[in-house]
């Protein structure tokens, strides 16, 4: 395993650990999710380039599209929670039920 893969895997692991440790605030959870998605994107792009697998060259771009949609939904939820309750705690998400 090359150093590039080890560094990318370490970035993914650190983002996952951050998500598990700082899960009380919605903003920190969203940032950790974005770090995980970006490390997955880089890992997929490097793997496709190293293996010369040109048929799957659109897969990292599709992953980025889903990551952008996830970020937009997460930020809109963050704005709604912070405008309603004044904080960005994840516990407030249970109070948003109709």
UniProtKB/Swiss-Prot annotation:
It catalyses: a ubiquinone + NADH + 5 H(+)(in) = a ubiquinol + NAD(+) + 4 H(+)(out). Its EC number is 7.1.1.2. It is a multi-pass membrane protein. The keyword Translocase applies. The chain crosses the membrane at residues 1-21, 29-49, 61-81. One of its GO terms (molecular function) is NADH dehydrogenase (ubiquinone) activity. It comes from the Eukaryota. Its main location: mitochondrion. InterPro entries: NADH_UbQ_OxRdtase_chain4L/K (IPR001133), NUOK/Mnh_C1-like (IPR039428). One of its GO terms (cellular component) is mitochondrial inner membrane. The keyword Translocase applies. GO terms for biological process: ATP synthesis coupled electron transport. It is found in: Mitochondrion inner membrane. Keywords: Electron transport, Membrane, Mitochondrion, Mitochondrion inner membrane, NAD, Respiratory chain, Translocase, Transmembrane, Transmembrane helix, Transport, Ubiquinone. Pfam families: Oxidored_q2. Core subunit of the mitochondrial membrane respiratory chain NADH dehydrogenase (Complex I) which catalyzes electron transfer from NADH through the respiratory chain, using ubiquinone as an electron acceptor. Part of the enzyme membrane arm which is embedded in the lipid bilayer and involved in proton translocation. Belongs to the complex I subunit 4L family. Core subunit of respiratory chain NADH dehydrogenase (Complex I) which is composed of 45 different subunits. This is NADH-ubiquinone oxidoreductase chain 4L. It comes from Puma concolor (Mountain lion). The gene is MT-ND4L.
């Amino acid at each position: 395993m090359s150093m590039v893969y080890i560094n990318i895997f370490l970035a993914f692991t650190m983002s996952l650990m951050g998500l598990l440790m700082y899960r009380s605030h919605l903003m920190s959870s969203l940032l950790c999710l974005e770090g995980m998605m970006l490390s997955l994107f880089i890992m997929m792009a490097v793997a496709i380039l190293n293996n010369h697998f040109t048929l799957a060259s659109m897969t990292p771009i599709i992953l980025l599209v889903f990551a952008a949609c996830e970020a937009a939904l997460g930020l809109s939820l963050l704005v709604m929670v912070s405008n309603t309750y004044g904080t960005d705690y994840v516990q407030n998400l249970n109070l948003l039920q109709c």
